[in-house]
A protein has these predicted regions:
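N-terminal alpha-helical interaction modules that lie
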Residues: 1-35, 43-44, 66-125
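Conserved interaction-surface patches within small, structured recognition/assembly domains
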Residues: 38-45, 60-61
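Alpha-solenoid repeat scaffolds
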Residues: 48-51, 86
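TPR repeat positional signature
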Residues: 18, 37, 52, 56-59
Length: 125
Protein backbone atom coordinates (compact mmCIF):
# COMPACT_ATOMS: atom_id res chain seq x y z
CA UNK A 1 0.00 0.00 0.00
CA UNK A 2 1.34 3.41 -0.96
CA UNK A 3 0.93 6.28 1.49
CA UNK A 4 0.44 9.77 0.13
CA UNK A 5 1.56 12.79 2.10
CA UNK A 6 2.11 16.14 0.43
CA UNK A 7 1.21 17.39 -3.00
CA UNK A 8 4.13 17.07 -5.45
CA UNK A 9 5.94 20.26 -6.46
CA UNK A 10 5.00 19.62 -10.10
CA UNK A 11 1.28 19.75 -9.24
CA UNK A 12 1.36 22.45 -6.58
CA UNK A 13 1.24 25.47 -8.98
CA UNK A 14 -1.97 24.18 -10.58
CA UNK A 15 -3.57 23.54 -7.18
CA UNK A 16 -2.59 27.00 -5.93
CA UNK A 17 -3.80 28.63 -9.15
CA UNK A 18 -7.26 27.12 -8.66
CA UNK A 19 -7.38 28.35 -5.06
CA UNK A 20 -6.30 31.83 -6.16
CA UNK A 21 -8.97 31.87 -8.88
CA UNK A 22 -11.50 30.78 -6.27
CA UNK A 23 -10.56 33.71 -4.02
CA UNK A 24 -10.71 36.20 -6.89
CA UNK A 25 -14.06 34.98 -8.17
CA UNK A 26 -15.53 34.88 -4.67
CA UNK A 27 -14.32 38.42 -3.95
CA UNK A 28 -15.95 39.58 -7.20
CA UNK A 29 -19.25 37.93 -6.27
CA UNK A 30 -19.01 35.26 -8.97
CA UNK A 31 -20.12 32.43 -6.69
CA UNK A 32 -20.72 29.79 -9.37
CA UNK A 33 -17.28 30.34 -10.89
CA UNK A 34 -15.69 30.47 -7.42
CA UNK A 35 -17.25 27.11 -6.54
CA UNK A 36 -16.07 25.62 -9.85
CA UNK A 37 -12.49 26.53 -8.96
CA UNK A 38 -12.86 24.90 -5.53
CA UNK A 39 -14.07 21.73 -7.25
CA UNK A 40 -11.09 21.81 -9.60
CA UNK A 41 -8.70 22.34 -6.66
CA UNK A 42 -10.38 19.36 -4.98
CA UNK A 43 -9.82 17.10 -7.98
CA UNK A 44 -6.20 18.21 -8.28
CA UNK A 45 -5.43 17.85 -4.57
CA UNK A 46 -7.66 14.99 -3.46
CA UNK A 47 -4.86 12.43 -3.55
CA UNK A 48 -2.89 14.37 -0.89
CA UNK A 49 -4.20 14.64 2.70
CA UNK A 50 -3.42 18.28 3.51
CA UNK A 51 -4.47 19.64 0.11
CA UNK A 52 -7.63 17.52 0.18
CA UNK A 53 -8.61 18.53 3.70
CA UNK A 54 -7.84 22.20 3.02
CA UNK A 55 -10.23 22.28 0.05
CA UNK A 56 -12.98 20.70 2.15
CA UNK A 57 -12.33 23.38 4.78
CA UNK A 58 -12.74 26.07 2.08
CA UNK A 59 -15.93 24.34 0.90
CA UNK A 60 -17.25 24.39 4.46
CA UNK A 61 -16.42 28.10 4.74
CA UNK A 62 -18.15 28.70 1.40
CA UNK A 63 -21.25 26.87 2.64
CA UNK A 64 -21.28 28.98 5.81
CA UNK A 65 -20.81 32.23 3.88
CA UNK A 66 -23.71 31.51 1.53
CA UNK A 67 -25.79 29.97 4.35
CA UNK A 68 -26.23 26.59 2.63
CA UNK A 69 -27.12 24.07 5.34
CA UNK A 70 -26.73 21.04 3.05
CA UNK A 71 -23.18 22.08 2.14
CA UNK A 72 -22.26 22.82 5.75
CA UNK A 73 -23.51 19.46 7.02
CA UNK A 74 -22.12 17.60 4.00
CA UNK A 75 -18.61 18.98 4.44
CA UNK A 76 -18.22 17.86 8.07
CA UNK A 77 -17.72 14.12 7.36
CA UNK A 78 -15.62 15.00 4.32
CA UNK A 79 -13.34 17.05 6.56
CA UNK A 80 -13.05 14.20 9.05
CA UNK A 81 -12.47 11.34 6.62
CA UNK A 82 -11.20 12.89 3.37
CA UNK A 83 -7.59 13.34 4.46
CA UNK A 84 -7.41 9.84 5.93
CA UNK A 85 -8.72 8.30 2.70
CA UNK A 86 -6.13 10.35 0.76
CA UNK A 87 -3.32 9.17 3.01
CA UNK A 88 -4.01 5.52 2.22
CA UNK A 89 -4.77 6.14 -1.46
CA UNK A 90 -8.48 5.31 -1.34
CA UNK A 91 -10.13 8.23 -3.10
CA UNK A 92 -12.95 8.47 -5.64
CA UNK A 93 -10.93 9.87 -8.55
CA UNK A 94 -12.53 12.92 -10.16
CA UNK A 95 -15.05 13.50 -7.38
CA UNK A 96 -15.61 17.28 -7.17
CA UNK A 97 -16.03 17.24 -3.37
CA UNK A 98 -19.28 19.13 -2.86
CA UNK A 99 -22.19 17.92 -0.76
CA UNK A 100 -24.29 17.80 -3.94
CA UNK A 101 -22.52 14.58 -5.03
CA UNK A 102 -22.00 11.23 -3.25
CA UNK A 103 -18.67 11.40 -1.39
CA UNK A 104 -17.37 8.02 -2.58
CA UNK A 105 -18.47 8.19 -6.22
CA UNK A 106 -15.73 8.56 -8.85
CA UNK A 107 -16.36 10.96 -11.74
CA UNK A 108 -14.78 11.36 -15.16
CA UNK A 109 -12.00 13.96 -15.15
CA UNK A 110 -12.36 16.72 -17.72
CA UNK A 111 -9.69 16.81 -20.43
CA UNK A 112 -8.13 20.07 -19.19
CA UNK A 113 -7.50 18.57 -15.75
CA UNK A 114 -6.22 15.34 -17.30
CA UNK A 115 -3.69 17.48 -19.19
CA UNK A 116 -2.60 19.12 -15.93
CA UNK A 117 -1.91 15.73 -14.35
CA UNK A 118 -0.05 14.65 -17.48
CA UNK A 119 2.13 17.81 -17.53
CA UNK A 120 2.88 17.34 -13.84
CA UNK A 121 3.85 13.70 -14.40
CA UNK A 122 1.13 12.43 -12.07
CA UNK A 123 -0.69 9.18 -12.75
CA UNK A 124 -4.37 9.12 -11.96
CA UNK A 125 -5.26 6.33 -9.57
Amino acid sequence: MKFYTSIPESLKPYYKAELNKYRTEYANGNLKSAWNHLERAHIIGQKYPYAHTFVHWKMLEFGIKIKNGKEIIGQIPRLIFGGVKSFVGKIPVGNPGGANVPPLKPFPIEKELQNIFEKAGIELI
